Amino acid sequence: APEYYVNLYTAESLAEPWRGDWNDCVRWERDSHSYHAQTAPSDESYIHQLPAGYYAAITHMDHQIGRLVSALVEEQIMDNTIILFVSDHGEMLGDHLMFQKAKPFQGSIRVPLFISGPERYVGKHGTVCTDLAELRDVMPTLLELAGAPIPETVDGTSLLLTVAR
């Protein structure tokens, strides 16, 4: 992320990674259970600063999405536009002494997914749904929004019914 966004987050303002019971183990025992134990950072101050870069990248992305929406509004085409944003994985950021997208812990599997557009397509603005959604649901959702048939061979399910509830 550009330096401007990195400077929004200071290491002092960030919480320590959640370790659970791992802090009670000796380092060699923790490392043997840690994903990427050979390549994961071991410097505690560096580990503490990792979230700043991650949060900076998210804030930068959020700003870019805002610019896109502003341009769509300015061009008067937002009323005919659907935006679906999703990430394929999260980041462990040192939680449970893990990094990247190693295991099915919350930091790795809980990712943003939002659908924005005219209410006639996506339902009431500001609706938050906490139901489980999967990446395989994205394609049938976009097909339904486009008015196209969803092939029977598709594993996913459109999220529109979920959002409409």
Regions flagged by a language model, labelled:
Residues 135, 139:
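Zinc-coordinating Cys/His ligand positions in small cysteine/histidine-rich zinc-finger domains
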Residues 154-165:
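Short, intrinsically disordered, charge-balanced linker/junction segments flanking boundaries
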Residues 1-132, 145-153:
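Active-site-proximal cap/lid insertion segments
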